[in-house]
Amino acid sequence: MPRPRPRALRGSSPGWALVAAVAVGAALLMATLAVAAPPGPRGPAARSPGLEDASVEPVEDGDYDEYDDEGHTPTDVPGSGPESPGPDRPPRGPGGGSGRRRGSPGNGTRSAARRQLRESLRRIQAEYAASAFYVCPPPTGATVVQFEEPRPCPDVAAGKNFTEGIAVVFKENIAPYKFTATKYYKEITVSQTWQGSRYLQLTGLYNDRAPVPFSEITDLINGKGRCRSDVTYTRSQRRVTAYDGDEWGREVALVPAKTSTPNSRGWYTTDRVYAPNAHAGFYKTGTTVNCIVEEMEARSAFPYDSFVLATGEFVYASPFSGFSEDARRERNRYAPDRFRQVDGFYPRDLDSGQRAATPVVRNLLTTPTFTVGWDWKPKRPNVCSVTKWQVVEEMVRAEYGSAFRFTSAALSATFTSNLTQYPPELIEHSDCVAREAAESIEAIYARRYNASHVRVGGVQYYLAAGGFLLAFQPLLSNSLAEMYRREALLGRSGDLAAALAPPPVAAPASGAGPRGTISTTQTVEFARLQFTYDHIQKHVNEMLGRIAAAWCQLQNQELVLWNEARKLNPGAIASATVGTRVGARMLGDVMAVSTCIPVSPDNVIMQNSMRIPGDPKTCYARPLVSFRYTDEGELVEGQLGEDNEIRLEQNNVEPCTVGHKRYFVFGGGYVYFEEYAYSHQVSRADVPVVSTFVDLNLTMLEDHEFLPLEVYTRREIKDSGLLDYAEVQRRNQLHALRFSDIDRIMNDSANAALMAGLARFFDGMGDAGKAIGRAVLGVTEGLISVVSGVSSFLSNPFGALAVGLLVLAGLVAAFFAMRYIMRLRANPMRALYPLTTSGIKAEARAALGSGGDKGGAGDGAAGVEDFDEAKLEAARDMIRYMTLVSAMERTAHKAKKRGTSARISAHLTDMVLAAQGAEYQPLSKDDEDGADP
């Protein structure tokens, strides 16, 4: 240990300037005194042999008015204490005289100068001297000490339980599940045109979409590569049928679309809109039905309860829904009759017309505007909530306190986790982790480590900070494994088992909820910072560790020097080692020590000469001092030792030499002796310092772990935009589903329920029942169609008006028919022959008019022709004959339509008429002879 420095003089550094000024003034004064002094012997050579004591005695002012016998002037030097009368002072000179002469006035001047110098030195010593002196009594052996043996130099612990291995780093899978979906729909376009005299104007255009029925998809589109040109769908709670080109439905071939993308294809039936020409000045409406099939990419994100097509339509059903035990638990928000799963479905390539050789399970789901189909796959092996991020061939795992650190130089990253394993079973949809980790680790081990390392246990899983899942396979080199094997054979396998034992595995708490998913940060900069810090920490700590080890080795080597130095100066070595001032001496291989007593600097007086009275060839090696333990104690003689130590013996002597110069530590500075006589005091600041200390202040870097810190979360980034496309599309498409009952609209026909019930009834009767059922259902559907048509016609306001007009017209016709029948009954001839009857009446009126003129008015009654009964009877026979002829003609006409029996009946009627007599003959215009006038 370093030697303790003596205490500095009291006061600040400006005091040393004052000391220097006083010293300069004293030097000038002494030079003046030297010039004025009488010549005489000076220095040690002129020392009087009669001087018995060379110590500085305290004198009163005015005592030094002359020189002593040797030319020396006793002087109090810095560090001297209060003066005492000195009753034990031996007499100077023979006869016990004082040996002093009374001087002249010049001597008085010199005495005054000396007194002034003494006062200045005392004032400086009282103000600035602060270093204590110590008196170390000789050790008696009651207390002995020994030096410590060399210490073992420990290494700096940079970590423990380092393990190398292979690692696979997994991250959160934010990519959606992607699959191929086929969209089936028919696009209806209704156009209205107005034909002018020379131009055609489009006055209206209506577009709509309708889903393709399941049967048409399976039988026509996938079966034949064709599609029907008509479609029946529901709009405004009514069943609507649209025909392409306003013609009856037919099967049309699907042709590839003109353009396609790498992830989508399309087929259609027509690319023209039907807009018929109308007559000039009239409107005409035309309908176009285009059957479209689109194959595109669909995506579904966790928790996979819906998916979205590439066109932006949302389908609110899980892509993994189906009829199996696990698939039934998947979410499907549509009615059961709108979903169908087809087993043994052979997809057809509509471009080449080839069918797939392997069947698949096909899901079909109809929505209000389209039908979507996709290949069903089980959920468990096809989706994974985590995905492989990095495969690290060299990963080092180190244990730091309560954490593991996985460091990869290839990635320049360090991942931190706790000491407990995190099995992937705690993560939902994580079946891919074990499979992919095993495949990657097996490939790396077979390619790189198969000949040099062995595996230690199985794959271990840890959840690192930042949401990274690490699959770690510990490895052990073959040489180290062989050493462990030998240790095991020697029965020292306890530490080996503890070192190779895998960490504990975390288990879910009892009654824990469903499994969750990990959330991985968007950046890995924190892991890179951790790697950088660990790299710097390792480098710095290794460097400081080497320095500390070298320092320890240096201390052990210096211990040998200490052991040798204690034999030369045991007191100094013991004081430097113990850290306090002690006295010491060697007792064999140990040191006996004694405690040093501190002495105030004010109680120490130094003598100005180092010569031994009576022996001119021998001098003291160190100055002599007088001291008191207390301020009022007796004066004790001693010798100044090293570093302000006062020795009670005065036996440190040496042969006197010429040109003697020495500096001795006295108080807070140095005293300078030249030719074994005091010269002056030197400040410590005036002596350049050569330091032997080597400062070593080492501070190890503390362990620090960087944690991920997100400035903006995913939700904040998502909400930073003005529009959320997914939310806008979702709201727009939910509008129709939210305010309309689509399912009830599609199933509101009571006739359809009746027909479905009849069909199920006849299906249960076997093949014959099915045949009868088809006939009955056909007739029933016809009747229902007629009744539905009549009811629909009557429910139409224009239809009701037309029916009313027809009824009114029927009533008017019945009225006129009834009137005609009444007239026929009253006057058949007039009813049957109105023109003939009118002519006969006109002739009768003319005959009556001419007869009256000839015969006079009185002969008017006689002029009327008498009615002939025979003619009347003949007229009646004529009417009856005409009736029979009319009946015969009707019978013959009906016989031609009805068949043989009717013809026989007509023939019999002819026979009856022929048997009745003569045929009809018209009446002669003249009267027969013999008739009455």
UniProtKB/Swiss-Prot annotation:
SUPFAM superfamilies: Viral glycoprotein ectodomain-like. A motif (Internalization motif) lies at residues 920-923. Glycans are attached at N107, N161, N418, N450, N697, N747. A motif (Golgi targeting) lies at residues 881-884. Disulfide bonds join C136-C596, C153-C552, C227-C291, C384-C432, C619-C656. It is a single-pass type I membrane protein. One of its GO terms (biological process) is symbiont entry into host cell. Residues 37-797 are virion surface. Residues 36-49 have a biased composition (Low complexity). The chain crosses the membrane at residues 798-818. Residues 1-36 form the signal peptide. GO terms for cellular component: host cell endosome membrane; host cell Golgi membrane; host cell plasma membrane; membrane; viral envelope; virion membrane. It comes from the Viruses. The keyword Manganese does not apply. Residues 54-69 have a biased composition (Acidic residues). Gene3D superfamilies: 1.20.5.1890, 2.30.29.100, 2.30.30.1230, 6.10.250.3280. Its main location: virion. Belongs to the herpesviridae glycoprotein B family. Homotrimer; disulfide-linked. Binds to heparan sulfate proteoglycans. Interacts with gH/gL heterodimer. Envelope glycoprotein that forms spikes at the surface of virion envelope. Essential for the initial attachment to heparan sulfate moieties of the host cell surface proteoglycans. Involved in fusion of viral and cellular membranes leading to virus entry into the host cell. Following initial binding to its host receptors, membrane fusion is mediated by the fusion machinery composed at least of gB and the heterodimer gH/gL. May be involved in the fusion between the virion envelope and the outer nuclear membrane during virion egress. This is Envelope glycoprotein B. It comes from Herpesvirus ateles type 1 (strain Lennette). The gene is gB.
